[in-house]
Structure formats: structure tokens, C-alpha cells
Amino acid sequence: MSSDPNFSLTSFLECLSQIEHEFLRDKVENPPVLVRKLQELQQKTPGHVASLLHDPETIQQIHQTAHRIEVAVKVFIHIDQKFTSGCSEVVHGTSKVMQEVNVGSPAVGCRNLSEDLPAYHMRKHFLLTLDSPYPTQEEKEGLVRLTNESTARVGLSNATRPPLEVHQLTLWFINARRRSGWSHILKKFAREDRSRMKRLVRAKLSSSTQSSPPSPMPEYPSNNLDNILSDNLGRPLTPADKQQFEDDWASMISWIKYGVKEKVGDWVYDLCAASKKTPKPGMPRPVTTVAKRQPARKTKPAAKPNSRTANPRASTTPSIDSTLDSSKLESTPELSMCSTADTSFSTFGSSLSMSHYNPFQDGNDILQSPTVKARGNRKVKALPKRAGKQQPDEVENGKIPFLCLSVAFV
């Protein structure tokens, strides 16, 4: 800027144009120089404004130049703020990614965490957020992605295992809080209050060799562990209470770091995969039920109730012409009335009319039959005392042999 004591609107405009030009060049050494020139211009202008000639055109150019400088300054300030915010987000995102893929050095609390355990990434997140193991939706999706990628990268033998889903991860955290003992500590030593649990966990982590979670809570100052336990219990802390808390804490950390034998393991996936396979022809289908694993107990069949109806008596009268065993014949009330007759004559109903048949025309042949001689000393069973009435349709249909009727009435 000119040091001429004669101050004018033209010199003022030239000074502003020079500042604008140097500001837009954006050199590292320019900001201090520009600030100094603006300060000098601010000091000279108020004393010469009243004596300046009124030149509307020059004044308009001065306003336009000042407006351009103001707009450029606001843009540069906005760019600088965005750049600073972007750098912070990049640094935070890079640190988060490095922690997820375990590129950087692991935290002190995760050094003993076995990578061979199932749900390694979920256990690690549980340990890092021990004060509040309730992952957000974004964190759940990230853990699901990491778990599925690590499973595919390791190349487990169980290739048919379905990928992990968000709702399964949510159930895992619910079970982990319960099975590890975190919920028990929350209920017994924090009055089921999450804010008290956060203070308790942070106090415990700060008093031990384990690292505290990466996001400290400034609204809760670091207090003594014994004081927090006493406040949560609502009474003076006893050595038994302190020992019980230490035991529960050690059990919880042990479950998270080292794990326990899972109740449901890989055999569930194997069983589901085997049930979907098509069995080969001729091979039995395996059924994994309790009845198949253990031999079935043989039970005695229930005895049939004794019927009070009389069993039909079999006639022991031998057949004259038939060679069948008479023990296989069953008796009927009609046959019992004429048990001394030969029942084989009933077979003549289809080929010979019974009305023209005389059973005694060959009497000598019958007496000479070897069957009659062999059974001459047989005993005839007693007839039933009361015989049922004979229905007329039975006689018409030929159910009662004609020979029996002839013997009965002769």
C-alpha cells in the first residue's frame, strides 16, 4: 500500500484490489502480510473519509471489491473447516478399520482373546464395550460383515454353514450378557441401572491392568471402586461383598476371553445339512430321534378280555368220502343236531339236487367203509342243551344239509 499521505478513493481502491489479488494467490506467507495491510487501511480510512471527494463510480467499485474479498474469505473459511472435519473423520475411520481387522496392536484387554473361538469378533467387541455391550445397528452390520468375511477367508470345512445374520448376532449378545454373568453383575451390584453399571465397569477397569473402553464418559468422574460398590449396594461394603464382586468379574472376563464349551456346536449344522441330502436308492433314511439312539423297550401286549360267549364246538364225526381232517371243521347249531351224519354231502348242492338223493341206497358200502370201522369206538360229544331256532331262509338257501333233516325226522 502507498505511503503517500494524500489519501483518496482511488488509492483506497488500489489497496483493496492488491489485497484481493494477493489473497486469491493463496501463498503460505500471504495471510500475515494481508492482515497487516488490512489493519493499516482500517486505521487510515476513518480520518480521511470526511475529506474525500464524492465519486459514485469509485465508491461502487470499492463496494464490489470489498464484497468479493468477503465472499472469498467465507469460502476459504468454510473449506478450511470442511478440511479439518474431513481429516478428523478419516483418522477416526482408519483407526476403526485397523481395530476391526486387527492391523494395529490390540488393546490390552484383548491380548489373551483367542482367535480360534467361535464369534471372535463379537467377543472382542463385547470386551471393548464392556461398560455397555449394546451394539448399535451400524456396529451390528459391521460385525456381521467381519464375521462372514473371516469365515470365508479361513475356509472352514463346514462350507454349508449359512452366513451370519443381524438378528442372530442380536440374539448372541443377549445370550452373552446373560451367560457371561454381565447381567448378574448389573442386577446385584448396579441395581439394574445401566448408568451405575457404566461407572462401576470404568472404575474397575481403571483400577486393574485392563484397558478401559476407548470412549471415556466425562460426565462420570473416575471414583474409587469401593465407594461405587458401597453406593450401589446402599450399605457399607464388606469383604465378602468385595470378594463376591471380584469372583463374578473374573468369571465374566474368563467367559469372554477364553469361552466355554458351547451347548450348540457345529453338529447342529451337520445335522441340518444331512437331513437335506437325498438318500441313495436302497439305503435307509437316518432318523436322529431318541427312539433310534436307544433300543426300544419291548412291552407285553395287552391281554384280550375273556369273552363270555361259548366257543363253537368242532364235530369229531369223520367224513365218509372226504380225506380232510375233521379237526379243522367248525360246528354250527345245525351240524350239532345231526353230528352222526357225514357233512361232506353239503358239497352236492352245486351239482346234484338234494331232493332226489337217497343216503341209504348204498347202506352196505357205508358200513364196510374203513373210516367207519376205524372210528367205531369213538365218543360223540354232547349236544348243546338249547339249539337256536332254525330260520326258514336258512333251509331255503341250503345252509342246513338235507341229510341232517332226513336223519333228524327218521
UniProtKB/Swiss-Prot annotation:
Lineage top rank: taxon: Eukaryota
Keyword Nucleus: yes
Cellular location(s): Nucleus
GO biological process: regulation of DNA-templated transcription
Basic residues bias spans: 375-388
Keyword match Ribonucleoprotein: no
InterPro entries listed in its UniProt record: HD, Homeodomain-like_sf, KN_HD, Ustilago_mating
Residue ranges of the region described as Disordered: 202-225, 278-336, 374-394
Amino acid composition bias (Polar residues), ranges on this chain: 306-336
Protein name per the record: Mating-type locus allele B7 protein
Species: Mycosarcoma maydis (Corn smut fungus)
Taxonomic lineage from the root: Eukaryota, Fungi, Dikarya, Basidiomycota, Ustilaginomycotina
